[in-house]
Amino acid sequence: MCGAPEQTQELPPGTDLSKQTVVAGTVRTAGEPLGGAYVRLLDDTGEFTAEVVSSASGQFRFFAAPGSWTIRALHRSGIGESTVTANTPGLYTVAVTVS
């Protein structure tokens, strides 16, 4: 079981987006939110960096360093992947479709 905090749409209190890079989004399948997916953050070399489980509403969130990231969602119903370039601090929203 993943020990990550519960995933919600709201950022934790005290999050300063002028200093922190946050990659967040929703995992979907057939247009519907997909909870219980293992969502992985991979760096620009494909190296595994972190993992969370998507919330019941499909949401996930990572605090990351600036850079190019791949977000991969794994679920018994399939796999989905998306990329994001987050070169500066801020909130970057990613949609991942599992099929």
What are these regions (language model features)?
Residues G3, R76-S99:
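Structured interaction patches on ligand/partner-binding surfaces of diverse proteins
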Residues A56, A65-P66, T88:
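Surface-exposed loops/turns
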Residues D44-Q59:
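Short, acidic Ser/Thr/Gly-rich low-complexity loop/linker segments typical of extracellular
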Residues M1-V22:
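Beta-strand-rich domain onsets/edges
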Residues T21-V23, T29-T45:
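Short, ordered, surface-exposed loop/turn motifs in non-cytosolic proteins
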Residues Q59-A64, V94-V96:
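Exposed aromatic-hydrophobic patches
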Residues P66-S77:
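A short, solvent-exposed beta-strand micro-motif common in secreted/extracellular proteins
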